[in-house]
From Swiss-Prot:
Post-translational modification, as annotated: One or more lysine residues are methylated.
Record SUPFAM superfamilies: Ribosomal L11/L12e N-terminal domain, Ribosomal protein L11, C-terminal domain
Subunit structure: Part of the ribosomal stalk of the 50S ribosomal subunit. Interacts with L10 and the large rRNA to form the base of the stalk. L10 forms an elongated spine to which L12 dimers bind in a sequential fashion forming a multimeric L10(L12)X complex.
GO MF, any single term: structural constituent of ribosome
NCBIfam families listed in its UniProt record: L11_bact
One Pfam family matching this protein: Ribosomal_L11_N
GO biological process: translation
Gene for this chain: rplK
Entry's transmembrane regions: none
Domain of life of the native organism: Bacteria
Keywords assigned: Methylation, Ribonucleoprotein, Ribosomal protein, RNA-binding, rRNA-binding
Name listed for the protein in its UniProt record: Large ribosomal subunit protein uL11
Family: Belongs to the universal ribosomal protein uL11 family.
SMART domains xrefs: RL11
Amino acid sequence: MAKKVAGQLKLQVKAGSANPSPPIGPALGQRGINIMEFCKAFNAATQEMEKGMPIPVVITYYQDKSFTFVMKQPPVSYFLKKEAKIQSGSKTPGKGAKAGTLTRAQVQSIAQAKMKDLNAADIEGAMAMIEGSARAMGLEVVG
């Protein structure tokens, strides 16, 4: 017989550095999920990834207090900042202050990496979404 799902929880956790401190501990603890078990499983699953990379994770927890989790790709903003080699986007996007520039080839590589997490029908649609995110961060797309 299948386990009865009690709920789902979405968190964004840095790769390789899940620990019981806030925000992870309280979010899991109030739902009765074993915090240390999640931290160990998540850190083991992300040990090959770049340390500190933000990973969205969807935790499905069951009435018997067990859980499963699915990791997604890092947010588009992470990839954009990494490709443009900047720490943060523009404070005033669209007002003339550019935070950096990206080429269409860089946007396409980000789109290919994020394709399964985006609700785009094809790579062109995914690129359009990513270009919109880039403009919102004050990045200019050239090429």
